């Protein structure tokens, strides 16, 4: 399978805002190259400092499926960059487009991706030899072409929430599972049953492989959000984007047990109020709102 790589030459100041735009537009993965990335906690940790050459600019690379309308997508990115430039210095803002093979991108991840600790969870690349210390829970991961490496702020927020809200014996539904990272973490924290769904066939395959890597039994299937799901769960988790979360808020109560938890993330800060209004409209009680960088997590519950 081939993918479009969209590369934007920008400033370190603007890289997070541009990453948010690209994720919103459906990027399956984003890689940031800048002069600070080596020292940032919870982000890429370089295997070899020789991989990194100091530059006076940053580059944000995003990967989109071959089926994308690349002309329309590029035009939309240009318009969003113009809007962003009104309040932040985006530098040159030059956009480059190329095609890459799935294998090439998968190998590129390995240059930057190393173990990441999030609470009691350690996300470990499948190719790394890593031994857990103390009571740490290891989640092995090969992200492939699916979103969810454990390094993105929205994923970190979700993993922290899973550690807080998922208890042994609970039933968990992961909507938009991506790499399967959240579903696997829930199972590692002794959830009784975990169902993981994604509309993307590539994500389903990647999640299945990651479940095998971790030796956990998870039901994984292609599905559009909660459509056709008749069971009810103690925890529903969705790390997607604001618009889809608002759509999901209309139906999530159908798959939640009474007084149980909906963990939602992937919400950029300027869309938080829209999401909260949607939850209020659909009678979801807000339990917790948490922010990390420009990303937000909302925990709500189904009231009786």
UniProtKB/Swiss-Prot annotation:
Keywords: Cytoplasm, Methyltransferase, S-adenosyl-L-methionine, Transferase. The keyword Zinc-finger does not apply. InterPro entries: Ribosomal_L11_MeTrfase_PrmA, Ribosomal_PrmA_MeTrfase, SAM-dependent_MTases_sf. Disulfide bonds: none annotated. It catalyses: L-lysyl-[protein] + 3 S-adenosyl-L-methionine = N(6),N(6),N(6)-trimethyl-L-lysyl-[protein] + 3 S-adenosyl-L-homocysteine + 3 H(+). The keyword Coiled coil does not apply. GO terms for molecular function: protein-lysine N-methyltransferase activity. It is found in: Cytoplasm. Its EC number is 2.1.1.-. One of its GO terms (biological process) is methylation. It comes from the Bacteria. S-adenosyl-L-methionine binds at residues 155, 176, 198, 239. Its main location: cytoplasm. SUPFAM superfamilies: S-adenosyl-L-methionine-dependent methyltransferases. GO terms for cellular component: cytoplasm. It is an enzyme of class 2 (transferase). Pfam families: PrmA (PF06325). Methylates ribosomal protein L11. Belongs to the methyltransferase superfamily. PrmA family. This is Ribosomal protein L11 methyltransferase. The lineage of its organism: Bacteria, Bacillati, Bacillota, Bacillota incertae sedis, Caldicellulosiruptorales. The gene is prmA.
């Amino acid at each position: 399978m081939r993918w479009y790589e969209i590369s934007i030459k920008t400033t370190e100041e603007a890289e997070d805002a541009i990453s948010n735009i690209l994720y919103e537009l459906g990027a399956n993965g984003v890689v940031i190259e800048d002069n600070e990335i080596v020292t940032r906690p919870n982000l890429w940790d370089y295997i070899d400092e020789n991989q990194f050459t100091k530059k006076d600019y940053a580059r944000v690379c995003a990967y989109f499926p071959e089926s994308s309308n690349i002309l329309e997508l590029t035009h939309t990115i240009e318009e969003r960059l113009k809007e962003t430039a009104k309040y932040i210095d985006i530098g040159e803002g030059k956009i480059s487009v190329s095609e890459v093979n799935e294998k090439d991108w998968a190998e590129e991840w390995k240059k930057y991706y190393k173990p990441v600790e999030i609470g009691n969870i350690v996300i470990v690349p499948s190719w790394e030899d890593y031994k857990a210390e103390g009571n740490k829970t290891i989640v092995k991961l090969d992200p492939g072409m699916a979103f969810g490496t454990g390094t993105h702020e929205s994923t970190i927020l979700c993993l922290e929430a899973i550690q807080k809200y998922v208890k042994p014996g609970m039933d968990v539904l992961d909507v938009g599972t991506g790499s399967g990272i959240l579903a696997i973490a829930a199972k590692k924290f002794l959830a009784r049953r975990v169902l993981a769904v994604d509309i993307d066939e590539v994500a389903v395959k990647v999640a299945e492989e990651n479940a095998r890597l971790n030796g956990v039994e998870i039901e994984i299937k292609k599905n559009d959000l909660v459509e056709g799901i008749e069971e009810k769960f103690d925890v529903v988790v969705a790390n997607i984007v604001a618009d889809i979360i608002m759509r999901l808020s209309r139906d999530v109560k159908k798959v939640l047990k009474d007084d149980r938890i909906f963990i939602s993330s992937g919400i950029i800060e300027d869309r938080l109020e829209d999401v909260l209004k949607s939850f209020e409209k659909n009678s979801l009680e807000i339990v917790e709102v948490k922010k990390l960088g420009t990303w937000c997590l909302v925990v709500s519950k189904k009231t009786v």
